[in-house]
């Protein structure tokens, strides 16, 4: 059984809701997770958030799902710009590691735009000297504001499947222009982690990247992976066969459970932190709602 608790943190930009999933047979491992939605959509109830968290909790992993602030969904609508969401995801990670909800190790991860935020938050922690995640789990990430052209093999697969061919350069340009409130060409490595250099990525923690198969966005993920390798990062890249972008948000597809299992296996392979020597409870700077079993 999994116990789910909704909490509101005093985040860097105001109230920050998070939802924590705790297994009744916890392993001690933890993951802070960010859903996707093009930076402007998505919530804690979507399969890419709730379904992923429940699936990982079934493996004994404690999951903190972050309800970060969104960019405007339409012109004139309310919303925030970069770097608000990235900073909130990083804050949630730091909070989780000191919350006492799991012994650790703690990982950070996300899907699509959420994977961008997880990668960005990790880069910020690396640069500022904050505690780093033991693993960065990126599912079909978007990591470049200016979308590179796919190779001939991927281009042919996209041309053969118009439903999958929906993240071309114009779409990605508009998505990042909305996130930034400006020209995507001016994006920095916090907004587009794929821009980070090998020098900037030195010391980056291990990465598991699970890409969708017929997905133009995987080009940016593969380029980021190449840079991480040159920087000396331990990185594993998997392409989930037969999938389109966002397969974690379609739990009816068998690949969703397969990908969740990959993340669980990689995280569970990490040694659990020893029990603390002090019985003191860590600070928990949040207002908690009553837990409910699910």
Q: For each predicted feature, which ranges?
A:
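Alpha/beta-hydrolase superfamily serine-hydrolase fold, recognizing
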Residues: 3-294
